[in-house]
């Protein structure tokens, strides 16, 4: 059986190192001797149930580790389920019992170091490049044994669409990019051209050929296929590493771009500059024949360079971008790749690109900023030196990215340990059930304190285009190292809220100097418009988006200010100002005022706000209303609050809940779930937004209806059912946050119980 390990390093591995003794690290191991026959049967039942329900629910329930942890905690739900008949109102006891059931269940899932494990997956182009990399380096069977490979195959099969393709994410329609990547992955994992479950390979290949063949794969796919030798580098748009030699004031310097874009094109520029091609094995030669519509030698690569399947083309290239690529391809590259500039310039540019790769690797303990970047940087290190320490350090961190659930083994973005935990702690604090949550809060507090980043990136970090990180919290753990404004704000809130409780109950409060460091970071990320960026200050103008080369992402070229980040920071700074009124008071007051103005300016005509990290308008409207309320804005005093409330009330469904489709994100307009279904997490977000806007005092009826839906949807053991995908990045790609279904319904019930039963009177 598979078992989840928490906080484990490897004392015998000299290539694995940590800044805080691996607190928050979560890794999976397969133990062939583990588990009773009943436990193994339960795992198989979970796998069968997932497949049976997948036409309705694409995201897994993340059951394998939950079953393990519940057994280890000897969990037994002793509070009876809450029954509320049609036409019956909610009592204070109903709300309390449902809340206690949710708390007892979720508390049993807390890990030994205080965080809540969970997968953050759902994107279907994360895993294949890892398989490609290890196929090239010869490590595929060394790193992944038969059980790993079996579970990888399971995951790929589980998420194949009926038409034979794979979507950008688990709920997406088939696209060329992910269909090609997953087809090649199946072949590298041992499936024949017509093999796989339910003729998976044959169906996928037919989809690819019916849509024009692999020359229609978007730019990132062209790069990976060129690396593999299934495509030719001359059919890709140039990514010259010489861009690292440009002066930093140059308007299109990579140092000015969004950090994720910079970290992707950093190793890509190295691979492009080297024109690296992996071993042309018999399988690669077969794939050339299987995936192209014409003989490989006859393909017009310059023409193929501009091709992209319509299913993948979210961001069509403007004319200025095509002119840029044509100029680089036809004039600049021929000069840079021939003597004398190849020796004088190209080789220097490759060295500089590699210096940046090593710098980022070391400062993230070889986790890197994310899984897309991880694989590219790891491959670059292997190309530089197959037996070098850099590559071995990358190998040591591969387990940090792998996750196993009932739908198989997948690659995570990198982890959401801190993010999930700070929301969970705030939800538990809102419950006001101290006798039942004290131990959980103490452990969570310890994890948060240990996870704070205590130093800036090493050396002259500004010359490496990095920002300060001291005082920050990351999305995952301290070793990751990358500051995030909303993660920092939510963790800062937790530390301050817990500091107001007895130390003998929740542990010693964090040193004020560490809070000051956090505030310093947050203030540094406020932009000219008053909003907060996510990772770094804005360095580039938004017109740079004209050069977005990705085809299927939007808003990827420049850092920008976000409503959710701004709201989280406002809430944290308001509380900080109350507890530390003498620290940078004027700056904090001004920051809050500017943040409020930014949120108000971003409201859409229908009263909603567009979300960047959750789906979508409901998510951002919850954040916006919470931030405005924290700053003292009320329904009476603020038009934006009234419009936000009106938006939420207008889209409430007949069953009392709310439900929004992931299509809202790319379409940039509110789209309800098909059939006007409700989603419990989105219902919780809407409830909390309304509660913060004072809905309970005006007319609590919408809240009662929503709470009834959540309570009556609770499962026998206190869990909540898994429903639609809820996270998003870059507007087009969705993420599955598996623990959201526990945190937010619990949190909403806690807030509802306080707001609707202020005097403990039943309805």
UniProtKB/Swiss-Prot annotation:
The active site is at residue 486. GO terms for cellular component: lipid droplet. The keyword Cytoplasm does not apply. Keywords: Isomerase, Repeat. The keyword Magnesium does not apply. It comes from the Eukaryota. It catalyses: (S)-2,3-epoxysqualene = beta-amyrin; (S)-2,3-epoxysqualene = alpha-amyrin; (S)-2,3-epoxysqualene = lupeol. PFTB repeats lie at residues 149-190, 592-632, 641-682. One of its GO terms (biological process) is triterpenoid biosynthetic process. One of its GO terms (molecular function) is beta-amyrin synthase activity. Its EC number is 5.4.99.39, 5.4.99.40, 5.4.99.41. It is an enzyme of class 5 (isomerase). Multifunctional enzyme that converts oxidosqualene to nine different triterpenes, mainly lupeol, beta-amyrin and alpha-amyrin in a 15:50:30 ratio. Belongs to the terpene cyclase/mutase family. This is Amyrin synthase LUP2.
């Amino acid at each position: 059986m598979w078992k989840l390990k928490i906080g484990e390093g490897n004392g015998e591995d000299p290539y694995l190192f940590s800044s805080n003794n691996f607190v928050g690290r979560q890794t999976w191991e397969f133990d062939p001797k583990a588990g009773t026959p009943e436990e193994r049967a339960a795992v198989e039942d979970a796998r069968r149930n997932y497949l049976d329900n997948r036409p309705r629910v694409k995201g897994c329930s993340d059951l394998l580790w939950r079953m393990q942890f519940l057994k280890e905690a000897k969990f037994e739900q002793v509070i009876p389920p809450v029954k509320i008949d049609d036409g019956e109102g909610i009592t204070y006891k109903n709300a309390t019992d449902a809340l206690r059931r949710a708390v007892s269940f979720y508390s049993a899932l807390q890990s030994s170091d205080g965080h809540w494990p969970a997968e953050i997956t759902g994107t279907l182009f994360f895993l294949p490049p890892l398989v490609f990399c290890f196929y090239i380096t010869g490590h595929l069977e060394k790193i992944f044994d038969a059980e790993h490979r079996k579970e990888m195959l399971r995951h790929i099969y589980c998420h194949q669409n009926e038409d034979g393709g794979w979507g950008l994410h688990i709920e997406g329609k088939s696209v060329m990019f992910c269909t090609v990547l997953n087809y090649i992955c199946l072949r590298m994992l041992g499936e024949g051209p017509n093999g796989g479950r339910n003729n998976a390979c044959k169906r996928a290949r037919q989809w690819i050929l019916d849509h024009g063949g692999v020359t229609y794969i978007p730019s990132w796919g062209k790069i990976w296929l060129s690396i593999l030798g299934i495509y030719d580098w001359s059919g890709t748009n140039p990514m010259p590493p010489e861009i690292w030699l440009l002066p930093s004031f140059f308007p299109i310097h990579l140092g000015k771009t969004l950090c994720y874009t910079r970290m992707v094109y950093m190793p890509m520029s190295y691979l492009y500059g080297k024109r690296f091609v992996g071993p042309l094995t018999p399988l690669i030669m077969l794939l050339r024949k299987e995936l192209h519509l014409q003989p490989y030698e006859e393909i017009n690569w310059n023409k193929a360079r501009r091709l992209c399947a319509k299913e993948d083309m979210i961001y069509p290239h403007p004319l200025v971008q095509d002119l840029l690529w044509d100029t680089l391809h036809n004039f600049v590259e021929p000069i840079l790749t021939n003597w004398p500039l190849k020796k004088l310039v190209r080789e220097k540019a490759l060295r500089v690109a590699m210096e940046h790769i090593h710098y980022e690797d070391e400062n993230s303990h070889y986790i890197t900023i994310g899984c897309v970047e991880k694989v590219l940087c790891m491959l670059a290190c292997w190309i530089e030196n197959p037996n070098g320490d850099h590559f071995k350090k990358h190998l040591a961190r591969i387990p940090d990215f792998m996750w196993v659930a009932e739908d198989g083994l997948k690659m995570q973005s990198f982890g959401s340990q801190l993010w999930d935990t700070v929301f969970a702690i705030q939800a538990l604090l809102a419950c006001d059930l101290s006798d039942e949550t004290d131990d959980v809060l103490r452990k969570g507090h310890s994890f948060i304190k240990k996870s704070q980043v205590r130093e800036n990136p090493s050396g002259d970090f500004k010359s490496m285009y990095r920002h300060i990180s001291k005082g920050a919290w990351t999305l995952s753990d301290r070793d990751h190292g990358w500051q995030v404004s909303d993660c920092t704000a939510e963790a800062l809130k937790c530390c301050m809220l817990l500091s107001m409780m007895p130390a003998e109950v929740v542990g010693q409060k964090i040193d004020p100097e560490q809070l000051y460091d956090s505030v310093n970071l947050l203030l540094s990320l406020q932009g000219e418009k008053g909003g907060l960026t996510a990772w770094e200050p804005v360095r580039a103008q938004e017109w740079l988006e004209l050069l977005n080369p990705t085809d299927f992402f939007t808003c990827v070229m420049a850092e920008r200010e976000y409503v959710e980040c701004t709201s989280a920071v406002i809430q944290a700074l308001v509380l900080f100002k109350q507890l530390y009124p003498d620290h940078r008071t004027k700056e904090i007051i001004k920051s809050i005022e500017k943040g409020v103005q930014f949120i108000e300016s971003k409201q859409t005509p229908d009263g909603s706000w567009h979300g960047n990290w959750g789906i979508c308008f409901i998510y951002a409207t919850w954040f916006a209303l919470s931030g405005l309320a924290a700053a003292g804005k009320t329904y009476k005093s603020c038009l934006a609050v009234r419009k936000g409330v009106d938006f939420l009330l207008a889209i409430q469904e007949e069953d009392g809940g709310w439900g929004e489709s992931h299509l809202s994100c790319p379409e940039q307009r509110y789209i309800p779930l098909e059939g006007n279904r409700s989603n419990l997490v989105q219902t919780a977000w809407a409830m909390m937004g309304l509660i913060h806007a004072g809905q309970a005092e005006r007319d609590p009826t919408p809240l009662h209806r929503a709470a009834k839906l959540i309570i009556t949807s609770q499962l026998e053991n206190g869990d909540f059912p898994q429903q639609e995908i809820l996270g998003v990045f870059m507007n087009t790609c969705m993420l599955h946050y598996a623990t959201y279904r526990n945190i937010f319904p619990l949190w909403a019930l806690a807030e509802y119980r306080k707001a609707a039963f202020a005097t403990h009177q039943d309805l």
